[in-house]
Amino acid sequence: MTWRSEHIWIELITGSRKISNFCWAFILFLGSLGFLLVGTSSYLGRNLISFFPPQQIIFFPQGLVMSFYGIAGLFISSYLWCTISWNVGSGYDRFDRKEGIVCIFRWGFPGKNRRIFLRFLIKDIQSVRIEVKEGISARRVLYMDIRGQGSIPLTRTDENLTPREIEQKAAELAYFLRVPIEVF
């Protein structure tokens, strides 16, 4: 979502609370829970899941491996649920021409650097850069080059923008900030 006026441009950044992350976390949780139940069923010799009799899967090595996969999947699923609940990666980009300041804010993982806040002067911005990598895993990322600081990504790497969309976004931002555009 973007909000613009004559002097201020604010762009809200979606973090890890995306539908795809919810789906993957839910599917991974259910799958790993199933693996763990099958492994536990084979260990106990009881039918905890009614799909098959427990005698079909012996505990060593199949049940043990399935239990391991179930536990590993639960750890990965809990990691995904934590990143979703903490909304890692969300934040905003604020470009203020009146004050001459650019503020970039992102939420990180809990701890010392939970809040990531970067502040730059607009006069230190050298250019808005588009990096394009074509091929099987095509990638188009918009960067802001800061004098003495390097490049700061303004779009997510998994945000699959069309060439037209990324060009339009770069052109609008470069026009707003009054800086040149570079394409790599």
Swiss-Prot record:
Keywords of this entry: Chloroplast, Membrane, Photosynthesis, Plastid, Thylakoid, Transmembrane, Transmembrane helix
Localization of this protein: Plastid, Chloroplast thylakoid membrane
Record keyword Plastid present: yes
Highest rank taxon of the organism: Eukaryota
BP-aspect Gene Ontology terms: photosynthesis
Cysteine pairings via disulfide bonds: none
Topology term for the membrane: Multi-pass membrane protein
Main location: plastid
Function: Seems to be required for the assembly of the photosystem I complex.
UniProt xrefs under NCBIfam families: PRK02542.1 (NF002712)
Family: Belongs to the Ycf4 family.
Protein name: Photosystem I assembly protein Ycf4
Top-level taxonomy: Eukaryota, Viridiplantae, Streptophyta, Embryophyta, Tracheophyta
Gene name in the database record: ycf4
